[in-house]
Amino acid sequence: MRSHYNIDLGISHVGQSVKLCGWVNSYRDHGGVIFIDLRDRSGIIQLVCDPNDSKEAHEIASNARNEFVLIAEGTIRPRGEGLVNPKLKTGEIEVVVSKLTIENESIVPPFAIADESVNEELRLKYRFLDLRNPKLYENFALRSKACIAARNSLANMGFLEVETPILTKATPEGARDYLVPSRVHQGEFYALPQSPQLFKQLLMCSGFDRYFQIAKCFRDEDLRADRQPEFTQIDVEMSFCEKKDVINVAETFLKDIFKACGKEIQTPFRQMQYKDAMENYGSDKPDLRFDLKFIDVIDIFAKSNNEIFANIAKDTKKNRIKAIRVPKGDTIFSKRQMQRFEEFVRKFGAEGLAFIQVKEDGLKGPLCKFFSEEDLNELSKRCKLEVGDVVFFGAGAKKTVLDYMGRFRIFLANELNLIDPNALEFLWVVDFPMFEQNDDGSYSAMHHPFTMPKNIDENDLEEISSIAYDVVLNGVELGGGSIRIHKNDIQQKVFKLLNIDEEQQKEKFGFLLDALSFGAPPHGGIAIGLDRLIMLVTGANSIREVIAFPKTQRAQCLMTEAPSPASNEAMRELGIKLRENIK
């Protein structure tokens, strides 16, 4: 129906006849000549409807309004002197219309398509209108390129694309499952997969050797800016591999994805042990676009005559005292800002925020009186302090201190404008603990219980490490993976350490244990969150900007009004009766 997309046209097409299709983005009547900005998925081009060129087209144009669907035929000409629009990629040209057709009309839209001030709820209610915005379209054009690049890259490395089931069995993977009642087997439920984890391991047991899938996953969890109840991941598994092999494959397809999106990245990515990431940055996904690395000063504080700090410093296993040096911070931060910093860390469990300022005549601040001159000199040397600097200290329980100082590090970086929004800093975080302790004292798998432990015979669960790895970009976890357990006895031992008894093992994971008993190969893999990846590539503020029809933070679709009540007939067929007064 059309001869070109708008964006395909430029000054080299002057004199050509074209046929264009799209929507009225804006409409202006200038003394009898009507100008229409015609929008298609690629962008905007200006139509000129002059009665001297075509009375019929001019008359039809006079009836057009915003969001009407038009088909326009005409000739490309250059814009007049001083009329070039540098904001448009087609700003050097316009189309003199000889024939115009209104294919469909539109009622008055609830908002202007390009209006960025419209609240998100209204945009999501009318998502089909919101998606007409060329800026959003560009997000999905990049997403499409990324998916094609991932498929091509993995296929070139010998991976086979295989689809795994959506209706499956509930397995504990860290979040709540979405359950689907069975009509045929009343009282029983399918679960929507949180990941294809077990199925891809079974494919390795089947001898498929190299698998991938761009997979839909579902998790019933509380939502944040970077979470959705349904999301997409680039899922990869391979046999007869070590950690370095999986990392090499992941770096290869990530490099190809970024190249397809117009960005060059350098490989290999740097690597950092989990322990070092936590101790130096207070996060297992540190943002390395800026420094502000922690400095360990617990040994110096152990010599202070402040009872609180001295007691904290006695137990170096359970407690931490960390410093963050801000060069020239004393010349930058006002007294009010220093108060704001303390208010910030208190929100995350800090008792306060101690600091020392570096003046021309030495170190100053309430802390200084608790240290000898020798200890202050050692502190100054350890922190590499210079005149004008300020150094902040966090002290207390290990988990609390690392958490709030990690958050404070990012807060400071934003305050100081240290983050380059165009930088791409990749990092592998490796050697994660196998288990983590919950608030109730019990233990759970830090990644998942199918991860291969390094030292399974260690008596202290907190000392058992795993062959697990996460890939981080600019402080955001893009994805993670591990070498898997491929031996039945090791898998059963991990289950027992997690207090999953033999009966539960058979009920929940019997099929996996069976598969591991029939000569399962060594295998491992990784999953990359596609939505997060595209969010970072496009610079979108929210993951909802890169998902065509996203849910709200209350897991609702405002457009379709899902979820919604089921009919009484459907409930009867499923054998389900709801309790009254459900809230």
Curated annotation (Swiss-Prot):
Q: Which reaction does it catalyse?
A: tRNA(Asx) + L-aspartate + ATP = L-aspartyl-tRNA(Asx) + AMP + diphosphate
Q: Which residues bind L-aspartate?
A: 173, 219, 447, 484
> Mind telling me what this protein is named?
Aspartate--tRNA(Asp/Asn) ligase
What positions are marked as the site Important for tRNA non-discrimination? Answer: 30, 82
Q: What is its EC number?
A: 6.1.1.23
What family is this protein classified in?
Belongs to the class-II aminoacyl-tRNA synthetase family. Type 1 subfamily.
Entry keyword annotation includes Protein biosynthesis: yes
Residues holding ATP: 219-221, 228, 477, 529-532
Gene3D superfamilies documented for this protein: Bira Bifunctional Protein, Domain 2 (3.30.930.10), GAD-like domain (3.30.1360.30), Nucleic acid-binding proteins (2.40.50.140)
